[in-house]
């Protein structure tokens, strides 16, 4: 009897094991097979950057990658090696014996998004700014040389390596030079200050002109807008009449190629490397997006066809956006709670607590928070930056440059508040984007974006270059 029961138990165990193995094999086979890709998806996956005929020694991107090469080393060779190494190893790639940016403690933690407080902060740190720039003279000289290069072009497919490259040092150098340039202009050394703005804004315009360039349109627009904000802050300072043309040229409209930001946002799946595996399983980027798993960059890019109205949709869906899978780089409840706490802080407290509060989260968290945090104190019910302000700085670059140029025209012409309405009527009204209406504060003598009230869906930026605004009457 016992032997019969043992034999029966053995059969049951044996067949159970065989069924389990068969089921596991079936699961492996099913998951091994991807859905057939559409022609659009196949074309996107097979997409290769155009042949790059730009010599390395004329390429801003290569210089940026090699800027931390050891003293006396060839920056371009180091940049090429670092880019190739990053393509193979991703985040684990590092330059050997690299130069590092050094500054005294506590670090200079002022950012241009602070608005007028940035100039005040730079004034308080004047001595340390000059000392730090002198101490890092090799890196500073390399950045200034990089500004003079004629081209910006990627050398490889950016989707596989661009997100892993360390470009922190060039941007740190730039922040110090930006602060120093503003102090130079404030001190009356206008030529030196303007020289920085001319070269730096030209640098980011080249980035916008590039194809398959890494920092792509969002980063290039952000840095260009920061320079433009620096110019805007300087408008309250006395400006010599003979320099008016230089200021106007600095804020010239973007070229048609530079204006094509919507196209770059719409098709740039490579920007968020988290979507790369998804593309192989879904037929197209739009099908991935249609599930509602929006990345924060998609939210602010204006590509949400579902959005009936920017503000209303965002306020209604913000919590679900941040708590959905793939909704952000930090798609979890602790990050969302930390995000709410940070956005409630004053700018001073935000700077003091940001790094500590974001320490447990992934690497992009600090950059992501700096984009979200409202530097001008106008918080919506979702604690987000005023939508029109955000679009102006990081998306609708040409309209934001146009706004600052208008401020400049008004400042240089010393216009009275009663003349502003007539001056604005001379502008090309149909050019205005839905969220880029202007309002005028006679007390502060400042133009600003009007609150967003129209739909973004289907809006395409114009390609025509703005005409020169008519000279206002005094």
Which residue ranges define each predicted feature?
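Short acidic linear motifs
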Residues: 2-474
């Amino acid at each position: 009897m016992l032997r019969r029961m043992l034999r029966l138990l053995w059969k049951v165990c044996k067949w159970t094991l065989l069924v389990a193995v068969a089921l596991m094999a079936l699961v492996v086979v099913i998951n091994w097979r991807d859905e057939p890709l559409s022609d659009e998806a196949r074309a996107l996956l097979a997409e290769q950057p155009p042949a790059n005929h730009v010599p390395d020694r004329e390429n801003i991107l290569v210089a940026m990658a090699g800027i931390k090469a050891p003293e006396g080393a060839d920056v371009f060779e180091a940049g090429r090696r670092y880019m190739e190494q990053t393509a193979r190893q991703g985040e684990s790639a590092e330059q050997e014996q690299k130069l590092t940016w050094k500054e005294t403690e506590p670090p200079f933690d002022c950012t241009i998004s602070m608005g007028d407080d940035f100039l005040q902060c730079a004034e308080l740190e004047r001595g340390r700014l000059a000392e730090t720039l002198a101490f890092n003279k090799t890196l500073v000289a390399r950045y200034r040389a990089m500004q003079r290069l004629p081209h910006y072009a990627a050398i490889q497919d950016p989707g596989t390596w661009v997100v892993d490259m360390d470009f922190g040092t060039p941007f740190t150098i730039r922040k110090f030079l930006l602060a120093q340039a503003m102090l130079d202009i404030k001190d009356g050394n206008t030529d030196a200050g303007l020289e920085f703005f001319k070269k730096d804004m030209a640098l980011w315009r080249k980035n916008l002109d590039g194809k398959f360039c890494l920092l792509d349109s969002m980063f290039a627009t952000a840095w260009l807008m920061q320079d433009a904000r620096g110019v805007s802050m300087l408008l309250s300072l006395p400006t010599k009449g003979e320099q008016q043309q230089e200021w106007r040229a600095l804020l010239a409209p973007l070229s048609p190629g530079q204006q094509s930001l919507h196209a770059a946002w719409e098709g740039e799946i490579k920007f968020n490397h988290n979507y790369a595996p998804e593309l192989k399983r879904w037929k197209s980027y739009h099908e991935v997006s249609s599930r509602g798993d929006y990345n924060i960059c998609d939210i602010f890019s204006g590509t949400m066809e579902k959005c009936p109205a920017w503000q209303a949709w965002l306020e209604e869906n913000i919590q679900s956006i941040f708590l959905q899978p793939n909704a952000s780089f930090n798609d979890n409840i602790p990050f969302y709670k930390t995000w709410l706490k940070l956005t409630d802080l004053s700018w001073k407290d935000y700077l003091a607590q940001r790094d500590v509060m974001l320490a447990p989260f992934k690497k992009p968290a600090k950059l992501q928070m700096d984009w979200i945090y409202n530097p001008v104190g106008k918080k919506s019910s979702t604690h987000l930056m005023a939508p029109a302000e955000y679009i102006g700085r990081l998306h609708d670059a040409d309209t934001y440059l146009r706004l600052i140029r208008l401020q400049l025209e008004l400042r240089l012409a010393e216009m009275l508040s009663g003349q502003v309405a007539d001056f604005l009527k001379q502008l090309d009204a149909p050019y205005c984007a839905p969220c880029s209406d202007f309002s005028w504060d006679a007390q502060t003598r400042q133009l600003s974006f009007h609150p967003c009230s129209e739909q973004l869906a289907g809006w395409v930026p114009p390609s025509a270059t703005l005409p020169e605004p008519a000279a206002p009457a005094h």
